[in-house]
Swiss-Prot record:
Zinc finger (C2H2-type): 150-172, 178-200, 206-228, 360-382, 388-410, 416-438, 444-466, 472-494
Any single GO BP term: retina development in camera-type eye
Disordered: annotated segments: 1-118, 492-541
Cell compartments where the protein resides: Nucleus
Keywords, comma-separated and alphabetical: DNA-binding, Metal-binding, Nucleus, Phosphoprotein, Repeat, Transcription, Transcription regulation, Zinc, Zinc-finger
A Pfam match: zf-C2H2
Keyword 4Fe-4S recorded: no
Protein name: Zinc finger protein 513
The family this protein is said to belong to: Belongs to the krueppel C2H2-type zinc-finger protein family.
Regions that span the bilayer: none
Length: 541
């Protein structure tokens, strides 16, 4: 067979081996196995002259090759009208320069140059603007299959997502893989750990649009916003209880409709698991609920006349937090700065003689709040429980915030600075009290005389003059006084230090260790000896 010559012989790369067409090009070009990476989307031209001897008289031919994988060389690929194979088959046809290759039909999006959308999970076709396979379409057709529901076998939890069910199952197994790096806190969900870390960083990203309230949890913000929106629920016909959030109210029982309440025995009284110290006459400060008042009178009994309200512990009536010196400028309704700002923004608060529209009220004092955790924290002022203790001194408090503020006494940190003078302190309440020196404001006024002052401690000390109480007694002589400063000054007469001992000073928040129990008077509310004595004995930390 005569050899075929080319005017411009070119080397063709075959299976990674370079073959010269002039020496070894014995077969037609269709028998070559060309590399796919060389021929992707490319056309190879073979320019041939007329053969000298007999042969085919074709001049120029254009041959096209489509991209094919290594393992799919036999048979036709789906979507292509012709097969790709080296074997002759009756179903194929010869390709020439004049023949046109039929292209598969394109969608309307591909004709405009757009990429096809995701495939339908039911029929596998491309999804468009409308339903792809007629399922659930406006023109009828079979309805879409229902979405899968993943349900818990241990409770009524149901979800559309399996990941939610796996996360929920950790609540039953007790697994808590997410742990805090600063404290022993652990949780089964990452979102809870993220919310917990804000307690260490102090971040409060959720802010109320109606008042300066800010918090670190979206749930707390939604609960707070219920104080701005919506009227309170109707009061209870028996005790006047109200709720801030609309809740289904229990229909009154037949005995309540008749106006008679069943009398319970003393053994059936439901009391909180707290060691309550109820002063004589304390029942006069209970809310106007007959049931609570009856229980309070059974606890308190009958005694002397009630003491003035100012002798009660200075706690915020909005959140239950114990107030420091300089806080609570409103007499009879002492409030912390955050609750006062909330009240200025339109939050209604209950009066000192009843819970008002607040759902959780203390049965031993006029304290009322919207939140049950605030009431539980407030009850520690009555029980005398102080779980938070300082590691460097005997100081203890019922609130963690007070302990953090006290620790600045040991560290010497003073983050609060006066903008008008070089004064700096470690307590925001002290800075506010110092600011009254520049402004001359005296918000604390006596209700029995014209006395006014700029510190709540001075007003408490002044009220002892009206009651005649002198709680500070000398253990050496019969000297008594109502002022802690006078008591320390008197101890110098006996050669003792400022706290009653040689060279010692009283730590803040506790009585001198050598003083007998008679040093402090036991008259008045027990809460005065537990919480109010700290304000009478020494300045706040």
């Amino acid at each position: 067979m005569p050899r075929r010559k080319q005017s411009h012989p070119q080397p063709v790369k075959c299976e990674g081996v370079k073959v010269d067409t002039e020496d070894s090009f014995d077969e037609g070009p269709g028998a070559l196995v060309l590399e796919s990476d060389l021929l992707l989307g490319q056309d190879l031209e073979f320019e041939e002259e007329e053969e000298e001897d007999e042969g085919d008289g074709h001049n120029d031919q254009l041959m096209g090759f489509e991209r094919d994988s290594e393992g799919d060389s036999q048979g036709a690929r789906p979507g292509l009208p012709y097969g790709l194979s080296d074997d002759e088959s009756g179903g194929g046809r010869a390709l020439s320069a004049e023949s046109e290759v039929e292209e598969p039909a394109r969608g309307p999006g591909e004709a405009r140059g757009e990429r096809p959308g995701p495939a339908c999970q039911l029929c596998g076709g491309p999804t468009g603007e409308g339903p792809c396979c007629g399922a659930g379409g406006p023109g009828g057709g079979p309805p879409l299959p229902p979405r899968l529901l993943y349900s818990c076998r241990l409770c009524a939890f149901v979800s559309h997502y399996s990941s939610h069910l796996k996360r929920h199952m950790q609540t039953h197994s007790g697994e808590k893989p997410f742990r805090c790096g600063r404290c022993p806190y652990a949780s089964a969900q990452l979102v809870n750990l993220t919310r917990h870390t804000r307690t260490h960083t102090g971040e409060k990203p959720y802010r109320c649009p109606h008042c300066p309230f800010a918090c670190s949890s979206l749930g707390n913000l939604r609960r707070h916003q219920r104080t701005h929106t919506g009227p309170p629920t109707p009061p209870c016909p028996t005790c006047g209880f109200r709720c801030c959030a609309p809740r289904p109210t229990r229909p009154p029982s037949p005995t309540e409709q008749e106006g008679t309440m069943p009398r319970r025995s003393e053994d059936a009284l439901i009391l909180p698991d707290l060691s309550l110290h109820v002063p004589p006459g304390g029942a006069s400060f209970l809310p106007d609920c007959g049931q609570l008042r009856g229980e309070g009178e059974s606890l308190c009994g009958t005694g002397s006349e009630p003491l003035p309200e100012l002798l009660f512990p200075w706690t915020c009536r909005g959140c239950g937090q114990e107030l420091e010196e300089g806080e609570g400028s409103r007499l009879g309704a002492a409030m912390c700065g955050r609750c006062m700002r909330g009240e200025a923004g339109g939050v209604a608060t209950g009066g000192p003689q009843g819970p008002g529209d607040k759902g959780f009220a203390c049965s031993l004092c006029p304290f009322a709040t919207h939140y049950p955790n605030h009431l539980a924290r407030h009850m520690k002022t009555h029980s005398g429980e102080k779980p938070f203790r300082c590691a460097r001194c005997p100081y203890a408090s019922a609130h963690l915030d007070n302990l953090k503020r006290h620790q600045r006494v040991h560290t010497g940190e003073k983050p609060y600075k006066c903008p008008l003078c070089p004064y700096a302190c470690g307590n925001l309440a002290n800075l506010k009290r110092h600011g009254r020196i520049h402004s001359g404001d005296k918000p604390f006024r006596c209700s029995l005389c014209n006395y006014s002052c700029n510190q709540s401690m001075n007003l408490k000390r002044h009220m002892l003059r009206h009651t005649g109480e002198k709680p500070f007694r000398c253990a050496t002589c019969a000297y008594t006084t109502g002022h802690w400063d006078n008591y320390k000054r008197h101890q110098k007469v006996h050669g003792h230090g400022g706290a009653g001992g040689p060279g010692l000073s009283a730590p803040e928040g506790w009585a001198p260790p050598h003083s007998p129990p008679s040093v402090l008077s036991t008259r008045g509310p027990a809460a005065l000896g537990a919480t109010g004595s700290r304000a009478l004995h020494s300045d706040s930390p």
